[in-house]
Amino acid sequence: MSEEWISDRMHLIDASGIRKVFDLAANMKNPINLSIGQPHFDTPEVIKDALCQAVRDGKNAYSQTQGIAPLIEKIQSRVDAEYHHDDRQVFISSGTSGALMLVLNALINPGDEVIVFDPFFVMYSHLAKVVGGKLVFVETYPDFSIDVEKVRDAITDRTKLILFNSPSNPTGYVASEAETRALAELAAEKNIALVSDEIYRAFCYDQPFVSPAAFNENVIVIDGLSKSHSMTGHRLGFVHGPQSVIQQMIKLQQYTFVCAPHPVQWAGLAALDCDISDRVEEYRQKRNLMRDRLADKYEISGAQGAFYMFLKTPWGTGTDFCTEAIKNNLLIIPGNVFSNRDTHIRISYAQENPILEQGAEILNRLADHKM
């Protein structure tokens, strides 16, 4: 009987394909796990100490919906120094996922079109559907670059928003300054909201990070500390954009998440002064290790940032390949979790080097084992 209570919108989305892979692998014993979407290192001690101190100091009640003033002020000063936009306002969100939910609810009406680049972060398509948006995919295969003319061709009079993610999950692709500028200028020309998911901005290995907000003062930026400071469980993000949009997101946060976790915001304040350059360099070296080990057997595009590689399977579908990998005690994610194609696999190199070496050995062995 309770099945009848489920809303229609919930039938538009499916459980995450990543969760399905984890369920499939539940009986694996000590798998070589290259599926992880979070850093392998622990939260820095200075952040833990700040969190514990905030709890001891009684920072355990609600904060202001928009976030604590010291954290907002510190981020706002950095944003102002980078962009020099008079109307760019910051607020603190309950994670970047919470921010995505807020911005889509604040901007999308039923039937509005949302442009998403394929491959895409798994959450984008589902959240857009939940708010009644119509997905319009722009393919970036084979090298995952942004062809702005394809975006222009995809725009209609119903286009409301473009979701952009660089460095990208799942491809690791980092958009060039030229691509980023062209996309930002197109959004401005067409009066379309451009949402830039910058959660991996710290992890750029071959070129500097460039935000579309540098070229379009109305870009809405979603960022956070989950990946850069290994705080995925803390649920702390931040957003900056035009005040008119930010105020609507704050209003919606008041009636949904209420606020970001209060003591975690004080930990975030400490995190902003925490040097993570050694971790970024470590991940650059891990990227290089995996690229060197796999280059003879796999086509490697992207992988200039984040901590992922999106590899074309040497045989079969991504699903077939991952099924065989699990039989060989290797846990990876099929590409159709992130794409309308099933031709690739996603691996994460957020792991200790001996595990990466074992994973690369299995991947190379599987490449020669055509089904």
Model-derived features with residue positions:
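N-terminal small-domain helix-loop-helix segment of the aminotransferase-like
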Residues: 2, 7-95, 102, 274, ...
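Helix C-cap/helix->beta junction micro-motif
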Residues: 28, 131, 189-190, 328, ...
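Flexible low-complexity scaffold tracts in large eukaryotic assembly proteins
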Residues: 34, 166-169
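PLP-dependent enzyme catalytic core of the Aspartate aminotransferase-like
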Residues: 77, 323, 327-332, 338-371
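PLP-dependent aminotransferase-like
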Residues: 106-164, 185
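Active-site pre-lysine segment of PLP-dependent enzymes
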Residues: 129, 136, 145-158, 170-194, ...
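Conserved core segment of the aminotransferase class I/II
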Residues: 217-284, 367
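Conserved glycine-rich beta-strand-loop-beta hairpin in the small C-terminal domain of fold type I
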Residues: 265, 269, 283-291, 300-312, ...
